[in-house]
């Protein structure tokens, strides 16, 4: 099922745009869950960082681990560089987030739905 970004809140759209920027900055063609989670954590006035801090999580450790995992992902040079597509894992997370949205009877997919889907 194609992802309907018109059903995303502004913050959720920004998270995907930021995730894409993270991937492109590292010459990575495949957009992964790690890119999205890092984007959610780094989001200005976002819920994810606040939630992790309230849970007592080591946020700097999580960010460091995400950066490390992202650095291990394949890089693309030359032809094809600059094009990004969603991995199967990330597509599954997006679909799970839409399921959460429907379960909660929300009209738009938010960062909360994405975070619930990632955590699941």
Model regions: which residues?
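Histone-fold recognition with a strong bias for associated Lys/Arg-rich disordered tails
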Residues: 1-120
């Amino acid at each position: 099922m194609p992802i309907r970004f018109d059903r995303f809140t502004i913050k959720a759209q920004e998270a995907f745009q930021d995730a894409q920027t993270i991937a492109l900055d590292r010459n990575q063609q495949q957009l992964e869950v790690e890119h999205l989670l890092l984007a959610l954590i780094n989001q200005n006035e976002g819920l994810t960082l606040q939630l992790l801090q309230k849970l007592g999580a080591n946020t700097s450790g999580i960010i460091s681990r995400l950066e490390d995992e992202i650095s291990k992902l394949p890089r693309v040079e030359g032809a094809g560089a600059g094009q990004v597509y969603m991995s199967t894992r990330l597509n599954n997370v997006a679909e799970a987030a839409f399921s959460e949205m429907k379960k909660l009877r929300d009209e738009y997919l938010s960062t909360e739905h994405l975070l619930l889907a990632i955590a699941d």
